[in-house]
């Protein structure tokens, strides 16, 4: 076991600098901004961004193990700026090589890319402000960066721990929110990872997500194949999980799901991102895009120089929609965990934990069932078991069983011909990537 490396380093990042704060406080009480208050005093408001790019020095915090390298910027809201998979050279979080703000945030400047942590309102009032930080090596060989603040709007306290473990290909987030006041307060928490997109990418929502909501649940449409008008655009059985099929700026949030994951996959690069968290604590599963049309392309140019389009896969804790706030009582602390991990070579995931992700697809034309798996650590002699549930409480039927060595560097795949699957009673008429998904199949790793 190799210990996780942790260090602080000065880095130079090309930057379009924000202007000076307005000296006058602003109390925009009736501002319509996803339920957030415009009364952000004592935060100052910045309303100008420079058109000139300069090299600027930032303090960066790094975590690195055998599989991942993570960079954080405490001077910019404590965001994760880069998350890099060393096994395949893939940035599983959108890596914006420049700091190029636009006036999107609650107090003005906001940047795309990385993972932003939105609280107590959206977008985070201090998203462009420095936060306090410290870091430590832990006894088990892991290492943690702690970043936090006492936010200015409600005087509540938020602390986030970012941890890497030895020999684990995932990032653990440990959040602690504390109401240090004598009054009940409201908050929301949405971790906001950006992912690079192109014509080969698809958002990976659990299979029980069959409808999605707009902000405030003011509109709803079927998912993934949209039928009807949404954001004033007409869809006729179009897969809106694919970036290339959404021409206009669009948000959607899962109506409900009993699964603990959400993600994205790039079929061109055969790699993607997964977020894993207890869906009872973190029910929020959202996608936002500027759209692939001309409006979206203009925003790409406004937010980056060369890194192209992205989408946001926001993950909400204690809420499934924006705006939807949660109460935190006087002296109450809320603790919760979220996990982000890369994966590769297995396509549109059907289920995932922090230990493994699995996919199963049946190709009617080829007459083959393909089962694949990815693990976040070395699993020697892992048992792969494919079963069908028995009828009327009977024992499960074992379709296939094998042992194999798996790791973040070595994924698993098996193809089972139709002749071996005669006992399968039925399959669903799914349309994900031209394949069909078996009904009732269980894959255990």
Each model region followed by its residue ranges:
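Surface beta-strand/loop "capping" patches
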Residues: 346-379
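Asparagine-centered strand-capping/turn motif at beta-strand->loop junctions
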Residues: 176-183, 373-375
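Extended, loop-rich substrate-binding clefts of extracytoplasmic carbohydrate-active enzymes
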Residues: 26-64, 112-169, 199, 297-326, ...
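Short, aromatic- and glycine-rich surface loops/edge beta-strands on solvent-exposed regions
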Residues: 384-386, 422-445
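Beta-strand-rich binding/interaction modules
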Residues: 367-402
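Short proline/glycine- and polar residue-rich coil/turn motifs
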Residues: 327-332, 403-410
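A contiguous, surface-exposed recognition patch within enzymatic or periplasmic domains that forms
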Residues: 2-5, 9-26, 61, 71, ...
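Aromatic sugar-binding surface patches on proteins
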Residues: 406-427
């Amino acid at each position: 076991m190799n210990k996780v490396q942790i260090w602080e380093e000065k880095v130079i990042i090309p930057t379009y600098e924000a202007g000076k704060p307005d000296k006058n406080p602003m109390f925009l009480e009736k501002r319509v901004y996803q339920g957030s208050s415009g009364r952000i005093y004592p935060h100052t408001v910045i309303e100008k961004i420079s058109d000139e790019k300069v090299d600027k020095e930032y303090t960066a915090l790094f975590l690195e193990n055998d599989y991942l390298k993570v960079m954080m910027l405490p001077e910019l809201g404590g965001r994760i700026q880069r998350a890099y998979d060393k096994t395949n050279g893939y940035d599983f979080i959108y890596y914006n090589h420049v700091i190029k703000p636009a006036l999107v945030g609650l107090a003005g400047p906001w940047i795309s890319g990385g993972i932003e942590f939105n609280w107590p309102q959206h977008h985070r009032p201090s998203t462009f402000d420095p936060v306090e930080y410290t870091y430590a090596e832990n006894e088990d060989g892991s290492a943690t960066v702690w970043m936090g603040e006492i936010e200015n709007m409600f005087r509540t306290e938020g602390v986030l721990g970012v941890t890497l473990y030895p020999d684990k290909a995932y990032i653990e987030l440990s959040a602690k929110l504390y109401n240090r006041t004598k009054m009940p307060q409201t908050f929301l928490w949405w971790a906001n990872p950006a992912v690079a997109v192109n014509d080969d990418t698809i958002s990976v929502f659990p299979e029980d997500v069959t409808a999605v909501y707009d902000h405030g649940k003011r509109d709803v449409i079927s998912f993934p194949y949209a039928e009807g008008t949404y954001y004033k655009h007409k869809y006729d059985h179009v897969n809106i999980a694919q970036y290339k099929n959404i021409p206009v700026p669009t948000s959607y949030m899962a109506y409900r799901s009993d699964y603990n994951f959400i993600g994205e996959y790039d079929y061109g690069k055969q790699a993607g991102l997964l977020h894993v968290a207890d869906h009872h604590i973190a029910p929020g599963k959202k996608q936002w895009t500027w759209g692939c049309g001309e409006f979206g392309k203009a925003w790409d140019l406004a937010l980056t120089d060369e890194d192209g389009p992205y989408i946001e896969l926001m993950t909400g804790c204690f809420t499934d929609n924006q705006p939807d706030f949660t109460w935190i009582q006087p002296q109450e602390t809320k603790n919760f965990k979220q996990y982000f991990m890369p994966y590769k070579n297995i396509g549109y995931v059907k289920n995932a934990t922090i230990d493994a992700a699995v996919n199963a697809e049946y190709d009617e034309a080829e007459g083959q069932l393909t089962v694949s798996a990815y693990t976040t650590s070395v699993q020697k002699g892992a048992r792969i078991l494919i079963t069908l549930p028995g009828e009327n409480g009977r024992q499960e039927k074992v379709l296939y069983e094998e042992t194999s060595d798996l790791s973040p560097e070595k994924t698993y795949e098996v193809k089972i011909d139709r002749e071996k699957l005669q006992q399968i009673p039925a399959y669903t008429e799914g349309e994900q990537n031209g394949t069909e998904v078996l009904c009732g199949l269980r894959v255990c790793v």
